[in-house]
Amino acid sequence: MRGQAAAPGPIWILAPLLLLLLLLGRWARAASGADIGPGTEQCTTLVQGKFFGYFSAAAVFPANASRCSWTLRNPDPRRYTLYMKVAKAPAPCSGPGRVRTYQFDSFLESTRTYLGVESFDEVLRLCDSSAPLAFLQASKQFLQMQRQQPPQDGDLGPQGEFPSSSDDFSVEYLVVGNRNPSHAACQMLCRWLDACLAGSRSSHPCGIMQTPCACLGGDVGDPASSPLVPRGDVCLRDGVAGGPENCLTSLTQDRGGHGSAGGWKLWSLWGECTRDCGGGLQTRTRTCLPTLGVEGGGCEGVLEEGRLCNRKACGPTGRSSSRSQSLRSTDARRREEFGDELQQFGFPSPQTGDPAAEEWSPWSVCSSTCGEGWQTRTRFCVSSSYSTQCSGPLREQRLCNNSAVCPVHGAWDEWSPWSLCSSTCGRGFRDRTRTCRPPQFGGNPCEGPEKQTKFCNIALCPGRAVDGNWNEWSSWSTCSASCSQGRQQRTRECNGPSYGGAECQGHWVETRDCFLQQCPVDGKWQAWASWGSCSVTCGGGSQRRERVCSGPFFGGAACQGPQDEYRQCGAQRCPEPHEICDEDNFGAVVWKETPAGEVAAVRCPRNATGLILRRCELDEEGIAFWEPPTYIRCVSIDYRNIQMMTREHLAKAQRGLPGEGVSEVIQTLLEISQDGTSYSGDLLSTIDVLRNMTEIFRRAYYSPTPGDVQNFVQIISNLLAEENRDKWEEAQLMGPNAKELFRLVEDFVDVIGFRMKDLRDAYQVTDNLVLSIHKLPASGATDISFPMKGWRATGDWAKVPEDRVTVSKSVFSTGLAEADDSSVFVVGTVLYRNLGSFLALQRNTTVLNSKVISVTVKPPPRSLLTPLEIEFAHMYNGTTNQTCILWDETDGPSSSAPPQLGPWSWRGCRTVPLDALRTRCLCDRLSTFAILAQLSADATMDKVTVPSVTLIVGCGVSSLTLLMLVIIYVSVWRYIRSERSVILINFCLSIISSNALILIGQTQTRNKVVCTLVAAFLHFFFLSSFCWVLTEAWQSYMAVTGRLRSRLVRKRFLCLGWGLPALVVAISVGFTKAKGYSTMNYCWLSLEGGLLYAFVGPAAAVVLVNMVIGILVFNKLVSKDGITDKKLKERAGASLWSSCVVLPLLALTWMSAVLAVTDRRSALFQILFAVFDSLEGFVIVMVHCILRREVQDAVKCRVVDRQEEGNGDSGGSFQNGHAQLMTDFEKDVDLACRSVLNKDIAACRTATITGTFKRPSLPEEEKMKLAKGPPPTFNSLPANVSKLHLHGSPRYPGGPLPDFPNHSLTLKKDKAPKSSFIGDGDIFKKLDSELSRAQEKALDTSYVILPTATATLRPKPKEEPKYSINIDQMPQTRLIHLSMAPDASFPTRSPPAREPPGGAPPEVPPVQPPPPPPPPPPPPQQPIPPPPTLEPAPPSLGDTGEPAAHPGPSSGAGAKNENVATLSVSSLERRKSRYAELDFEKIMHTRKRHQDMFQDLNRKLQHAAEKEKEVPGADSKPEKQQTPNKRAWESLRKPHGTPAWVKKELEPLPPSPLELRSVEWEKAGATIPLVGQDIIDLQTEV
């Protein structure tokens, strides 16, 4: 009865716990078996989301699997701890180290690397069967058991399973929360801890280091069957709550049964009621523990008590059960003997029963066989009715003594505290010990371990770096194919490195081929081929594709199914021919035919990546046309490389690695952006790079420096350069990229303000934006104004900023007093110079009329108590309806707002007009602000494609007048050819070119390349016009000072007029790289950056130098000893007056031109330019054409020439019909002579004639040489006389000519160059003596060369000359032979008519004529009489009437013939008659102008002679002999002997200063087309 009543208690307690364990075990088995099976080879089991489970090695690691693992995942290592209990196999492992157990943090699948690996092989020791149980505690993410190598064939049982004696172990796992663990989990964990510590020893420490549960003491028998009975929430030791160690101490003491104190145990649970109804009885008991060492110590009180139960009356059918029980007596049994009878939670209750009771039973045997014990007796109360009760106890106890001495068993003392961990880092050991009190009187020794050991792990060891190491290779997997060729592989894992060690090197997987046997291969369809082309491109067609059957092989089955299939295609409507864009070759790319609405794509150029897109669209008439291609997806290689480098740095920053090289990336991007962007995709790429840089700055990866901040802002400025305008327009096609720019700058201000600790104020001024950053505390903050005092701007556009921003100090208040004391605010203000033109807000009627200003405050305030004040200066005049707008991406579309505003909104800002040029905006939020204005009806800001009418009129009038002047000069160039004329024509060309470029520049503002070229050339021609004015002044100065001598001066004029402007422009373009040449509004130098000084500076210098030269020329004109030549003085005065008038007018013209070009809205500047430009053209024509006397005379002569040509008086012609051309000199002489054709020539004196064409004054040093040297004689004429003409010497004295009536001197031109005429006869000696005696006289003699038109001169028949002068017109030439008949009293000796050998001095002619035959003996010489005295009577030109066809030997000169065409005699007669009454006084006025002509022609002839020297083969051929009937004077060419009057030994003559020296012609290699006729046309004998 007593055992039956006590049994239900423990069963009721254990039933729920056993049920829970059973369910969890089955759940774990089901989860584990879901992923594995006997047939799988690669078996992996992952357990997660479970808190308790069980598995066996045979289920998880099947025998035929090559590599298996079991993994338990911790839900959260910070909140849960994993515990494992392993029941080892009874026999040791056949393969040691086959199964490994470890924990790790994570596993990288790509590299097969375990991170944070910690092995538990040392803790579990699965192959050590000496400890049947092993426990471990894991705190990382994963706990894994993995079989490293498969079992060998000898290890497998008969069914291929693990033998139970080797590797058949079982595992229980438990997941316990670190805080407030569950009661059931703590019960199981405490049992595990108890078993772990019970079996722990030095060789096998306990693997459970600590528990979150408060384990309580209780009866611990078999850990697997004896549940712990909780006694409270904590474990007590000496009255203090402790941990699991205290609980384990109590458990051990209770298990030994030797308590230190006696007394009653707690009451057991109430037993079963004796009756179902009508009142029954329940009882409960308790146990008395005797006090050790106290003799006779017992417990006072009853051992058992009862109470009534089921008091309900029984019904008619009710039954009452009556059972009898005997009361238990108190004994001294040990606790273990009571077993499950020991109950708890009992409460005393009065016994009830019948008044009559039975008698006491006999006393029981003494409870102790030795020493003091207890005896008990009991009685029963017999109930007779329900109203009576038994009085008194039902059981009694008494002490009893036994004479035998009781044995005292050994007892354990308290456990010592746990020792310190044996290792300060890594895995170590802790232990504790206890002392056993020795047994006495044959007692039993102490049971249980004397020492307990467990693992400990305080911290990770920070030792040296540990490199990652590979685990062993797994075995080769089963061949992937059961037959034919297959693959096998094996893998290995890497234990991750620690403390910065190196990664595992090598591959984690290896593969190899395997072949088992040939397999029968069925036929298998290959993949479908791609669909073929549609049968029609539109209107409905079909496509076909097919597949190929591979096989069958080795007896396999054939392929099943169709081999090809069809589908419909091309259902769209066919486009009409006019709806297709034709193939086009545009931008060096061939664009194929594309239907309208589609986009064609081609690869970007080689220097970029991506695609060029071009859309085909329909116009309003439905005709397809190509749109311009877009390069929005093209990114240059340099920008792409920078973008990839930045992304790599950002990836490192996100992983927390140290950063290096960020500053170099920013510097490289700055250098690339300064060179400009090639494509619109470069802009988007740069924004992406800057965005990534901002993210890098935000992290601890890299701290930006002030240089990085400056480079960052400069890069943004480079993006906003004018040359990127068209690329920004393309970039807007992919979305509003302006908001990305605003967001980028805002994030940059935030990052820089808070990442740079030493930052207070920062100003960054660039060409296109100004950035201001202020960092200030909230406490004591004042109003912030932009720009601040002490503005340090360097750019021209930002030196005097017209836009202002005021941020009230109320913005810097957070509303919390504590926060305001420590808060720091960053205020960023950005002023964009030209961003408004990139935002596509400019329309036909509206325009962004201000710069764009962005204001940022970090951290952003909740609201603005005081509005933000922004003052804008208007950019355009003539606008109305100024409206403040702000950038608001969150603002929805408003019905009242125009659709073109986009994210711009006018809500939140109030407009306050200040004046006509300024507007104030009061805004209640922080954003980006600007002003939108309405254009007036007559104004539009669109780019005009044609210049204004005013500019066209001004440039046209000026250019036409100057062009007319150039045409006039060209038409009369042979009359007015001079250096001054050359300078004037160059000056006019520079002005005409400037006017044309001004008009072209007005139409090319959108074409960047053309506009830049126009600006550069306009700069060049503006400067050249100033330089040519300076050149004219310089020429005048050199003329008045007499230094205008050589052709080198002319080259200097060209260098000054064209070279100096070209040098200035080249230097400007080189230094600026063409930046500043052209802007978005005009094709001229930018007004900012200082490039305009490249024009203003040189122009001002030219004006200053011109003034200085003008002053010097003026002083020369007004001084007494200044210019004596009246003509030169007049020219110098005209040049000075021209400079004084033209130069100021030129400066005003170009100044107004610059203003008109740069400000196209101003009509005043355009009108001023038109007036000044037109006036300049008229003034230049007036000064240099209408008022210039030379031009007037030249025009008159030109008109006369045209009239004469119309009348047929052409001045002679060749025999073959070609017109004979006059030289410039002949024409000028003819011009000067025509005005006096019918005058009396009697007044013309010999001195006048000879002094007209005298040689220009020589330099002083040459004059001195001539004065010291011997007087010139006829014996040594200048060599160039025979080559070109007879040119008078200024040093020849002209005395009265002697009367030689019977002698004549005939000079004929020979083809050989540099002929010398040498005479030693008496007549020449006489002439020499006469000339030397008359040297002191002032008259100069000259050789006069008459023009070609002298054939029309009319002779004066009435003139009777004193001297017999015969003028013989030579046939074929215009050479006039003047001969004087000698008197009879003046005998002369005629030299033989033969040519001296050599024909000339050896150093002169380059080609020697053929050797002549032996000459005849010379005739006897006659003495020369003294010459008669010549009176200074004016000679007259007489006409002999017929030419001297056969000059006799008395001619006195060796004549040479020329093989040229014969001139008509009638033409010569007409010219003679025309010059009969010539007034040679008029010829003197043209002498100065013709001096240079003579020099140039002389150089030409000299150069031709040198050419003949260089090519001897061409001139050494003998001339073809002509028949006598064609040439009357052929006999003159017959060779003769050397005459007696020619000196046989010629001494070398010193070069005469009168001889014109040869100067290299402009092009040395050019062939000068001069024939004999051209040379002879210039010679005339006087």
UniProtKB/Swiss-Prot annotation:
<dbReference type="GO" id="GO:0010596">
    <property type="term" value="P:negative regulation of endothelial cell migration"/>
</dbReference>
<dbReference type="GO" id="GO:0004930">
    <property type="term" value="F:G protein-coupled receptor activity"/>
</dbReference>
<feature type="disulfide bond">
    <location>
        <begin position="366"/>
        <end position="400"/>
    </location>
</feature>
<dbReference type="InterPro" id="IPR008077">
    <property type="entry name" value="GPCR_2_brain_angio_inhib"/>
</dbReference>
<feature type="domain" description="TSP type-1 2">
    <location>
        <begin position="354"/>
        <end position="407"/>
    </location>
</feature>
<feature type="topological domain" description="Cytoplasmic">
    <location>
        <begin position="1188"/>
        <end position="1582"/>
    </location>
</feature>
<feature type="transmembrane region" description="Helical; Name=2">
    <location>
        <begin position="981"/>
        <end position="1001"/>
    </location>
</feature>
<keyword id="KW-0597">Phosphoprotein</keyword>
<feature type="disulfide bond">
    <location>
        <begin position="370"/>
        <end position="406"/>
    </location>
</feature>
<dbReference type="InterPro" id="IPR017981">
    <property type="entry name" value="GPCR_2-like_7TM"/>
</dbReference>
<keyword id="KW-0472">Membrane</keyword>
<feature type="disulfide bond">
    <location>
        <begin position="288"/>
        <end position="299"/>
    </location>
</feature>
<keyword id="KW-0812">Transmembrane</keyword>
<comment type="function">
    <text>Phosphatidylserine receptor which enhances the engulfment of apoptotic cells. Also mediates the binding and engulfment of Gram-negative bacteria. Stimulates production of reactive oxygen species by macrophages in response to Gram-negative bacteria, resulting in enhanced microbicidal macrophage activity. In the gastric mucosa, required for recognition and engulfment of apoptotic gastric epithelial cells. Promotes myoblast fusion. Activates the Rho pathway in a G-protein-dependent manner.</text>
</comment>
<feature type="transmembrane region" description="Helical; Name=3">
    <location>
        <begin position="1009"/>
        <end position="1029"/>
    </location>
</feature>
<feature type="transmembrane region" description="Helical; Name=4">
    <location>
        <begin position="1053"/>
        <end position="1073"/>
    </location>
</feature>
<feature type="topological domain" description="Extracellular">
    <location>
        <begin position="1002"/>
        <end position="1008"/>
    </location>
</feature>
<keyword id="KW-0770">Synapse</keyword>
<feature type="topological domain" description="Cytoplasmic">
    <location>
        <begin position="970"/>
        <end position="980"/>
    </location>
</feature>
<dbReference type="GO" id="GO:0043197">
    <property type="term" value="C:dendritic spine"/>
</dbReference>
<feature type="disulfide bond">
    <location>
        <begin position="604"/>
        <end position="634"/>
    </location>
</feature>
<keyword id="KW-0391">Immunity</keyword>
<dbReference type="GO" id="GO:0005886">
    <property type="term" value="C:plasma membrane"/>
</dbReference>
<feature type="disulfide bond">
    <location>
        <begin position="483"/>
        <end position="519"/>
    </location>
</feature>
<dbReference type="GO" id="GO:0048167">
    <property type="term" value="P:regulation of synaptic plasticity"/>
</dbReference>
<feature type="signal peptide">
    <location>
        <begin position="1"/>
        <end position="33"/>
    </location>
</feature>
<dbReference type="Pfam" id="PF16489">
    <property type="entry name" value="GAIN"/>
</dbReference>
<feature type="disulfide bond">
    <location>
        <begin position="273"/>
        <end position="309"/>
    </location>
</feature>
<keyword id="KW-0964">Secreted</keyword>
<keyword id="KW-0581">Phagocytosis</keyword>
<dbReference type="Pfam" id="PF00090">
    <property type="entry name" value="TSP_1"/>
</dbReference>
<keyword id="KW-0399">Innate immunity</keyword>
<dbReference type="GO" id="GO:0031397">
    <property type="term" value="P:negative regulation of protein ubiquitination"/>
</dbReference>
<dbReference type="Pfam" id="PF19188">
    <property type="entry name" value="AGRB_N"/>
</dbReference>
<dbReference type="GO" id="GO:0006911">
    <property type="term" value="P:phagocytosis, engulfment"/>
</dbReference>
<keyword id="KW-0675">Receptor</keyword>
<feature type="topological domain" description="Extracellular">
    <location>
        <begin position="1074"/>
        <end position="1093"/>
    </location>
</feature>
<feature type="domain" description="GAIN-B">
    <location>
        <begin position="760"/>
        <end position="939"/>
    </location>
</feature>
<feature type="disulfide bond">
    <location>
        <begin position="277"/>
        <end position="314"/>
    </location>
</feature>
<feature type="transmembrane region" description="Helical; Name=7">
    <location>
        <begin position="1167"/>
        <end position="1187"/>
    </location>
</feature>
<feature type="domain" description="TSP type-1 4">
    <location>
        <begin position="467"/>
        <end position="520"/>
    </location>
</feature>
<feature type="transmembrane region" description="Helical; Name=1">
    <location>
        <begin position="949"/>
        <end position="969"/>
    </location>
</feature>
